[in-house]
Amino acid sequence: MLKPLGDRVVLEVEEKEQKVGGFVIAGAGQDATKTAKVVAVGEGIRTLNGELVAPSVKAGDTVLVESHVGTEVKDGEEKYLVVNEVNILAIVE
């Protein structure tokens, strides 16, 4: 399992597929945002005076994230996206 550092968040992105005229078009290339499940969260970020600011998201949350941000990583057979918390636009309730 991946344990992110600082304000980084590990996401499992929901893959969407779209069919046009019998061809499958990957959804990630179509939308400005994508939906993902939070798998793991770093401890947060430190202020200039050393205080820890806890992240706003927690494992299990469903979030809306910008499409073209983050780093794709593999942990075994699983694919994840590691992003900074600032790239998460909203928590989906």
UniProtKB/Swiss-Prot annotation:
Keyword annotations of the record: Chaperone, Cytoplasm
InterPro entries (alphabetical): Chaperonin_GroES, Chaperonin_GroES_sf, Chaprnonin_Cpn10_CS, GroES-like_sf
Entry's Gene Ontology molecular function annotations: ATP binding; metal ion binding; protein folding chaperone; protein-folding chaperone binding; unfolded protein binding
PROSITE patterns in the record: CHAPERONINS_CPN10
BP GO annotations: chaperone cofactor-dependent protein refolding
Localization: Cytoplasm
Coarse class of the protein's main subcellular location: cytoplasm
GO CC annotation terms, alphabetical: cytoplasm
Function: Together with the chaperonin GroEL, plays an essential role in assisting protein folding. The GroEL-GroES system forms a nano-cage that allows encapsulation of the non-native substrate proteins and provides a physical environment optimized to promote and accelerate protein folding. GroES binds to the apical surface of the GroEL ring, thereby capping the opening of the GroEL channel.
Subunit structure, interactors included: Heptamer of 7 subunits arranged in a ring. Interacts with the chaperonin GroEL.
Family listed: Belongs to the GroES chaperonin family.
Name of the protein described by the UniProt record: Co-chaperonin GroES
Species in which this protein is naturally found: Streptococcus intermedius
